[in-house]
UniProtKB/Swiss-Prot annotation:
PROSITE patterns: RBFA. The gene is rbfA. InterPro entries: KH_dom-like_a/b (IPR015946), RbfA (IPR000238), RbfA_dom_sf (IPR023799), Ribosome-bd_factorA_CS (IPR020053). GO terms for cellular component: cytosol. It comes from Saccharophagus degradans (strain 2-40 / ATCC 43961 / DSM 17024). One of several proteins that assist in the late maturation steps of the functional core of the 30S ribosomal subunit. Associates with free 30S ribosomal subunits (but not with 30S subunits that are part of 70S ribosomes or polysomes). Required for efficient processing of 16S rRNA. May interact with the 5'-terminal helix region of 16S rRNA. This is Ribosome-binding factor A. It is found in: Cytoplasm.
Amino acid sequence: MPREFFRSDRIADAIQRSLARVIQTEVRDPRLGLVNINSVDVTRDLSIAKVYVTVVGAKEESESEVAVKVLNKAAGFLRNVIAKELTMRSAPRLSFFYDRTAVQGQNLSNLIDRAVAADKQRSEDEGE
């Protein structure tokens, strides 16, 4: 059975594509770096959009948090550009959040790799 797509889902996808382009081309802040828009959640009434981002090449989480603060300060400008681009009468209010899922996934992968290596070492030690 096909899943229904609500208008808010379509708007979220359009905002994600638009933000990815606008942030790279029109936001000129050296603290920003290369930003990935991971997902956008828009409320059903289209009044608020939560934008989850990661910063490529950020060595520490604090660098990503600085980028999120820069994006939140530029939210009004970005909202205006998106409203014009998507020809919306009023665009949702944008709130940016650092998406920790990539970091958590990498940490989990490292834990699994260490557990597999320890298990392999243990089985080799028992085999001798």
